[in-house]
Structure formats: C-alpha cells, structure tokens
Amino acid sequence: MDRDFPIVVQHVSKTYSNSRVGAVPTLEDINLSVRRGEFVCLLGSSGCGKSTLLNIMAGLDTPDSGQVLRHGLPVTHPGTERTVVFQEFALFPWLNVLSNVMFGLRKTKLPREEKERIAREKLAAVGLAYYEKAQVHELSGGMKQRVAIARALAPHPEILLMDEPFSALDAMTRESLYGDMQTLCSRQGVTVVFVTHNVREAVCLGDRVVLLSPNPGRICREWTIDLPRPRHINQAVVTEHAAVITECLRRESAAQLTPTL
C-alpha cells in the first residue's frame, strides 16, 4: 500500500489566527491518497486552503491535527524527494541560469561536474539548453518558470508539488508549458500535486481533479480524467469535462452564499 501511494493525507485540519476576526478554519478533515506517478490537481476558489494543503505536504507548514505520510512515515520537514514550484519564480537574480538549477542539488553529495551535467540535462528538457549562462533578468516570465521547473526536477524528486505555477503567464506561454509538463512528468515518472483555480488547466493536466470547498477547505468532489495524452487546453473533450466541473463549482459557491435559516 505504502509503495503504491507515496503521499497520503490523513484527517488534516488547520486553523490560522487573524487579529481582526480571530481563529480562521482553513482546512477540515482532509483525506487524500496520491498514487505513484499520478498527476493530481487540487482545484477550488481562492481561500479554500489549496496552497495551505500543498505547504503541509511539502513540510513547509504543519497541521493542527492529522498528518501527511510519505511511504508510511510522517512528513515533518522539507526534503529533496518532495520539491516545490511556486507561482513566483523564486530564482536568485545574482546567479546565472545554470547555477540556479544547480541550487536544487545543493543538498546532494555529488561532485560539481555531475551537478553541472544534471543541470544541463534538465535545462535541455525544458528547452533552455542554450541559456545556461544567461542572467535571470534577461529571461521572459515563461523562461523563468522553465528554469524553476528544471531546478525542481534536478534532484530527481519522487513528488513534485506545484502551486499555481502558470497563473502569472500569458495564454500562449501557458499552453506551451502544459505540453511540456505532460511530457516531462511522464518521462521522469514523477508524482505531481498541482494547485490551480483554472478548471480547464486542471482537466488538461490532471489524471484526477480534486475539488475543495471553502470556509473551511474540505474535499467535496473528485473526478478521474480518463483522456488520452498529450492533451491540449482547447480540445473539445477538455472543454466538455471542464464544463461539468465548472457547473459543480458554481453550485458549490452558490451553496456557500445561501444563508442558513
């Protein structure tokens, strides 16, 4: 069981304190098992706790109750087997592209020559083989995110956690990255948990879409996306699946706004 599901969320709840309104429940009794090699999209409106859940999976935050297990062992801190790609590119402007990717290997004991080889391999995989000496300020937004993805993949993680990584990019760049992500994840065999509020993006990328309702965040629906790959954001079947999920999202939002008498 543990080998089939590298990351398992068990009864996770989280509450934050707000100086104006007091305790704010963010997550409530979240249970989720992610199968090895699966691409799971966490979908929901702003404030439903998607990013909080991802941070807990990454070991960057802790739950108030419940736990996250990796192969049966509690996740209590970050690790190179679980890497994160954020919405912000989080690159170091004083390092060139190659050095930024090599930073992802800083905790390994590999010799520098091997780190450089791996970094170049990952840059080639994201289409940036000829930009290793470029400075961060010379890159477009899409290129910066490709560098961030290459850095996250450099240590050969088992689990890749992605927090709305494409939301700040233009539509054409996003569409290109959708195809790249499907290819990269398939080749490397990585398990992906991907946070988004974009329904078509979730259908295009995900093997499974998990919908969180807000206030507090709870898992309210799941869909298995059994469509052949590669998928394209404008495919009719993607649009059709997205329409079904969007309608469910609308109903969930309406239920949240309906006063209880």
Regions found by a protein language model. Name each.
Residues 160-163:
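Catalytic Walker B motif of ABC-type/P-loop ATPase nucleotide-binding domains
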Residues 98-106, 116, 224:
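Short helical segment in ABC ATPase nucleotide-binding domains corresponding to the A-loop/adjacent helical element
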Residues 58:
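Helix-to-loop junction immediately C-terminal to a conserved catalytic motif
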Residues 102, 113-131, 183:
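Conserved ABC ATPase "signature" region
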Residues 66-78:
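Conserved ABC transporter NBD signature motif
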Residues 2-6, 15-29:
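A short, flexible loop at the N-terminus of ABC-type nucleotide-binding domains that lies
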